Amino acid sequence: MRKEFCEKDNILITYTENDVCFEDCKTADAVLLANDGTVIHSNFNNEKTEYYKDYFKRIYSTITSFRSFDSL
């Protein structure tokens, strides 16, 4: 089941045990990243995709903590 991490600057960030998704709330464009940071799907341009891959690296430890709390 997909869980909501947060919404910031009209970007909704959600996660499952296997992936993290960044979705633009205005356009519904999104990038879906596997836990290792590889792109599963993206309809953002390359620049935005790379931006969210970098952002993913910065927040991944927090998402991992959320996953741990979810399992309690």
What are these regions (language model features)?
Residues 1-10:
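Negatively charged, low-complexity tracts enriched in Asp/Glu with abundant Ser/Thr
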Residues 10-11, 20, 57-61:
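Short linear sequence elements within intrinsically disordered, low-complexity coil regions
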Residues 11-12, 67:
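Broad hydrophobic/π-residue packing in well-ordered secondary structure
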Residues 13-47:
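A short, structured beta-strand/loop element
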Residues 39-72:
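Mixed-charge, Lys/Arg-enriched low-complexity segments
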